[in-house]
Design a protein with these regions (language model features):
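Charged helix-capping and loop-helix junction motifs
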Residues: 211-216, 242-245
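Conserved beta-strand scaffold positions in the cores of enzyme catalytic domains, especially
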Residues: 36, 75-77, 87, 136-138, ...
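Conserved short loop/turn motifs at secondary-structure junctions
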Residues: 91, 202-207, 232-237, 261-267, ...
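Active-site neighborhoods of metal-dependent hydrolases
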Residues: 148-209, 247-251, 256-406
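Divalent metal-dependent hydrolysis catalytic cores, especially in the metallo-beta-lactamase
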Residues: 101-122, 133-144, 191-206, 224-233, ...
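Active-site microenvironment of metallo-dependent hydrolases
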Residues: 6, 10, 16-20, 25-53, ...
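Metal-associated gating/positioning segment near the N- to mid-region
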Residues: 68-131
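Flexible loop/turn segments at secondary-structure boundaries
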Residues: 95-96, 119-121, 144-148, 205-209, ...
Length: 499
């Protein structure tokens, strides 16, 4: 399959080069495009192209890049707009159309659930129906497989109600060797079924996952050639022990590693953590990381960390925690009541400092991901990450604070995530780029106006300045609103069996 796609891409590249060599007149008269985008400032972070160009799109692919306008029955005038590769979100818990809608309006064309993952992979995305708003995919969710093996009634309850009690046996009880072997068998089957790596929620299972189980996971990842996407075990502010643990296991096993939401885990130690990651990369460890540009964490109130010394860990108190769905600020009494009566409920614990975020995003190769929370409807509030992560970076860190160049920010939102995935999922070789033969996953935004409008008080507000979003060549957002055409997303799986 990959070889056929490669031949097609090469053919498209040569065809477009031949057409462009004839001059603008030949392109406008002879080329048959489904859609053209004219007069835009095209930024491709891989080739470093940053210039006025026009794009020709056919069958979901970019087939022409021209210095002069192109002509077709359908066109977009991108005057005054930046044309960028569609954004790839490696870390989102959006599991339903309502969440995907928010991310699409924020410029995300590929939504991936890689930290927690999914199980079974074959059923991931079925709730999205036949026309998903964005491309999507998931890693193999170790936690859910662990629940299947150790506490099957709990996973059945998740399937019935969607509610997860993280104080149950699967999140607190170490596995014996027989259980580890069963977890391994199911995980291998799920990787063979297309899982995009392995999702490992170590911090949520601090007491549960012992060294043999952890080492089994990393050894499997190395054998299959996929990364482990890990939420590291958490210590007090800045403690690097959780990072050092997974770096050592990755180096010993040869597994690829991705550290989720570094700013939220490292806290004031972001520089030290990134120095350790850079040192590991220099030794040959394949390790990457990400951050989100918000200042609150979000977790189920039954999470293991809230059974530990969480006030010392986060350096906050009960009054810094909100009940996510209503925005209620908690007291010790209401916190403990919710722990008993609503163990599935989400909190927003406000402990992240803007300074940590700025220090993280200023370092090379740190990607951006939303860590958006599950959202079945708009009746219950969640953190605003899903509605305003990409646009917050573009508005705040690029335009207002000038911490990043526009091209650098676009790379962290598109190219770098594609490069993290493409070694084991070949579909990503055509994403995160504006090049002939690349997928026509594109965003068009006004760099002078783009900004997140969502907030903790109003988490569902669509951003400003995000004018068009194309998914597979389909105009899915037009003039900042969902279009009638939206629904061109496809499921993405690994390509381990294609070679």
């Amino acid at each position: 399959m990959f070889n056929q796609a490669l031949h097609l891409a090469v053919g498209l590249r040569f065809a477009a080069v031949a057409v462009l060599a004839l001059g603008a007149g030949a392109v406008t008269a002879d080329a048959d495009y489904d859609l053209v985008i004219n007069h835009g400032r095209v930024i491709d972070p891989e080739s470093q192209l940053d210039a006025m160009r026009s794009l020709g799109i056919r069958q979901g692919k970019i087939v022409a890049i021209s210095e002069t306008p192109l002509r077709a029955d359908r066109s977009i005038d991108a005057s005054g707009l930046v044309v960028s590769p569609g954004f790839i979100n490696l870390h989102s818990h959006s599991m339903a159309e309502s969440g995907y809608r928010l991310e699409l309006l924020d410029g995300v064309t590929t939504v991936l659930e890689l930290e927690a993952g999914a199980f079974p992979i074959a059923r991931h995305g079925r709730r999205l129906g036949e026309g998903p708003l964005t491309h999507f995919g998931a890693s193999v969710g170790h936690a859910w497989i662990r629940m299947q093996v150790i506490d099957p009634e709990a996973i059945a309850e998740v399937a019935r109600s969607g509610r997860i009690d993280m104080s149950g046996r699967a999140f607190t009880q170490p596995a014996n060797q027989e259980e580890i072997d069963r977890i391994k068998m199911i995980m291998e089957r799920e990787l063979a079924g297309g899982g995009l790596g392995i999702g490992l929620l170590l911090d949520y299972m601090t007491r549960a996952v012992n060294d043999p189980e952890r080492d089994m996971i990393f050894s499997m990842a190395a054998r299959f050639g996929v990364p482990v996407f890990v939420h590291v075990r958490r210590g007090i502010d800045g403690d690097p022990a959780g990072l050092e643990e997974v770096l050592a296991v990755a180096e010993r096993s040869g597994a690829s590693l991705h550290i989720c939401h570094l700013n939220a885990s490292a806290m004031s130690g972001v520089d030290d953590w990134l120095d350790k990651i850079d040192a590991a990369r220099a030794r040959g460890v394949d390790v990457t990381t990400e951050m989100f540009p918000w200042t609150s964490g979000s977790a189920a109130i039954s999470s293991d960390v809230f059974s530990r010394n969480w006030r010392e860990i986060f350096a906050i108190d009960y009054g810094d925690v909100q009940w996510a769905e209503t925005g209620e600020w908690l007291t010790e009494a209401t916190f403990n009541t919710y722990r008993i009566e609503r163990p599935d409920g989400q909190t927003m614990h406000h402990y992240i400092r803007e300074d940590w975020n700025r220090r993280a995003i200023s370092r090379p190769h740190v990607m951006v991901a939303s860590d958006a929370m599950p959202l079945a409807n708009y009746e219950r509030k969640v953190v605003p990450n899903g509605a305003g992560t990409s646009t917050r970076v573009l508005g705040q860190y690029v335009r207002e604070e000038r911490l990043l160049t526009l091209s650098d920010a676009i790379a962290r939102l598109s190219l770098l995530p594609a490069q993290r995935m493409e070694a084991f999922a070949s579909a990503f070789r055509d994403k995160g780029r504006i090049q002939v033969g690349a997928d026509a996953d594109l965003v068009l935004f006004d760099a002078a106006r783009v900004a997140a409008r969502a907030s903790y008080e109003s988490p569902f507000l669509a951003p400003a300045g995000m004018e068009y979003v194309l998914v597979g060549g389909t105009v899915s957002v037009r003039d900042g609103a969902l279009s009638d055409e939206a629904g061109a997303g496809i499921k993405l799986i690994n390509s381990l069996g294609d070679d």
